C-alpha cells in the first residue's frame, strides 16, 4: 500500500510516539513484555486489516472450560486473532507473540506451537517484527531498531521508511488466508 504525503505525516508522528513509548518503558519499567501489549493492540487495530478482525488479549488467561478453545499447543499466546463475529465459535486466524526488546528473536518451540495451533503468527519485540505462516520461514521481517550496545536503555532507531514499510504490510496483511 502506498501512503499519501498526509498519511506519511500522520504515520511519522505515530512512529515518534511509538519510539518514545518504547524508550520510556525501557528506562522507567525495564520494558517488561506487557509494556508492549497496548502499543501492539493500538498499531494492529489502527490498520485496515485490523479493522476486519477481533484482536483479543489472552496473555493472562488461565485454562478454564470457556477459555480452552483459545489455548494452543504452546499455551496461550499474548493475543489471539479471531473472526470479527460476536460469537464464541469465531474462527481463529492467528496470534501475536511479544517479547522484550532484549530477548532473542529466534524461532522457539513456543512459536512453533503457536504456528501449529493458529496458522499465522506475528512475533515481535517491538523492534523486530516477524510474520510467519505455518511451516514457513518468516514471510516478512521488519527492523525498526536495535538496542544500543553502549547503553542498554537506549535504542538505535531505523529511519521512518522502515515504519512506513511495516505499516503498509500490516495494512494489507490477510489474516484469513
Region locations from a protein language model:
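A short, conserved, highly charged catalytic patch centered on acidic carboxylates
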Residues: 1-120, 128, 132-177
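Charged, structured surface patches that assemble and position nucleic-acid processing machinery
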Residues: 125
Amino acid at each position: 500500500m502506498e501512503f499519501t504525503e498526509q498519511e506519511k505525516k500522520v504515520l511519522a508522528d505515530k512512529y515518534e510516539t511509538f519510539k518514545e513509548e518504547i524508550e520510556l518503558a525501557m528506562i522507567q519499567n525495564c520494558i517488561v513484555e506487557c509494556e508492549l501489549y497496548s502499543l501492539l493492540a493500538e498499531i494492529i487495530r489502527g490498520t485496515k486489516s485490523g479493522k476486519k478482525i477481533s484482536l483479543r488479549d489472552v496473555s493472562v488467561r488461565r485454562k478454564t472450560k470457556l477459555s480452552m478453545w483459545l489455548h494452543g499447543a504452546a499455551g496461550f499466546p499474548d493475543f489471539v486473532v479471531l473472526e470479527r463475529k460476536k460469537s464464541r465459535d469465531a474462527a481463529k486466524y492467528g496470534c501475536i507473540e511479544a517479547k522484550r526488546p532484549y530477548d532473542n528473536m529466534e524461532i522457539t518451540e513456543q512459536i512453533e506451537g503457536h504456528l501449529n495451533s493458529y496458522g499465522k503468527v506475528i512475533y515481535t519485540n517491538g523492534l523486530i517484527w516477524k510474520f510467519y505462516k505455518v511451516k514457513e520461514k518468516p514471510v516478512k521481517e521488519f527492523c525498526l531498531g536495535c538496542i544500543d550496545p553502549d547503553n542498554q536503555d537506549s535504542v538505535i532507531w531505523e529511519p521512518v521508511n522502515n515504519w512506513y514499510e511495516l505499516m503498509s504490510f500490516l495494512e494489507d496483511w490477510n489474516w484469513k488466508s
